[in-house]
Amino acid sequence: SFDSAKPILEIMGKNIFHAGDLGCGNGAKICNNMALGISMIGASEALMLAKRLNIDIKKVHEIMKSASGNSWPISVYPPLPGLKEGVPSNNKYRPGFSAGMMSKDLKLAIECAEEVKANTPLGSEANKIYEKFCKEGNDNKDFSAISKVVGGDAWDYEIDN
């Protein structure tokens, strides 16, 4: 049972949840990661738009952190270098959570959505974007390197090969 496993799980992590019946935890994980993949693309788009508009990205980042545009990718795991210490974007996108793992989770989320006839247009688009990014040889980069896709020719950051 969950209660008997909880002490062991607490050794492995600090946020332990009981999501429901068998399999619900996996479902919750892919729902969370679908939202994360979508929001990382959105954060990347917003910051790269600021760059193209010649607005100081650090200023936009500060504004977004304290405004309605805040999200986990903005406040905790920014997709562009120089915005926060200790994140993969400041380490040539060496993975914390790889693009390949994000692509796998997005694919699983879309398969589950299709199975239960859930409408997930943003999840489907994020899945396509990450799948293409991985097929281009980026599956072992951090998932925040997706900023390279939306940045186009304005993206001029160093990435680990």
Q: Which residues are covered by each model-predicted region?
A:
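Rossmann-fold dinucleotide-binding core
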Residues: 1-37
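ATP-dependent carboxylate/acyl-activation modules
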Residues: 10, 159-161
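Helical "substrate-binding/catalytic lid" subdomain
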Residues: 24-153, 157
